[in-house]
């Protein structure tokens, strides 16, 4: 487990929200999130336009289905639905984040206003065993999801 704990970072509040936004703006990002709010639809669309993939749950009604359907028409092979998805994981090129935060205004706020919920997350670097396990987990989950 070389390096698995050396540079892991615990994030909360605005620091967490900023890291989520930064990760989503990268290339080939993979995100598994329970819910995607309407305020984060454009960030999701931008992420998918850069080769990203997303897994989410639409069955509980918290993800904006109309926004997701519009994005799916543009990127049909980049979105998968998994019933019961409750994890919040973002895998970037050099960092991965496991957190409590959905992609929503309540959780992360917007750039000019903070979120209303108390959220926390753990950032893992690419050298950690956890990072590699998250990559494998996401890829397996994506393959098993419904288009």
Listing of model-derived features with the role each one plays in the protein:
Residues 77-82:
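General small-molecule cofactor/ligand-binding pocket signal
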Residues 8-9, 13, 98-147:
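Signature of lipid phosphatidyltransferase scaffolds
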Residues 86-91, 120-122:
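Short beta-strand scaffold segments in enzyme catalytic cores
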């Amino acid at each position: 487990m070389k390096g698995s704990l050396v540079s892991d970072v615990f994030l909360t509040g605005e620091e967490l929200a900023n890291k989520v936004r930064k990760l989503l703006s990268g290339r080939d990002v993979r995100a598994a999130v329970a819910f995607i709010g309407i305020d984060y639809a454009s960030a999701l669309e931008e992420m998918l336009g850069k080769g990203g993939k997303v897994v989410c749950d639409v069955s509980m009604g918290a993800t904006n289905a109309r926004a997701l359907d519009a994005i799916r028409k543009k990127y049909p092979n980049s979105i998968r639905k998994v019933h019961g998805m409750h994890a919040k994981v973002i895998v970037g090129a050099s960092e991965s984040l496991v957190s409590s935060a959905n992609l929503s205004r309540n959780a992360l706020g917007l750039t000019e206003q903070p979120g209303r919920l108390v959220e926390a997350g753990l950032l893992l670097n690419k050298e950690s065993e956890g990072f590699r396990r998250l990559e494998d987990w996401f890829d397996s989950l994506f393959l098993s999801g419904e288009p």
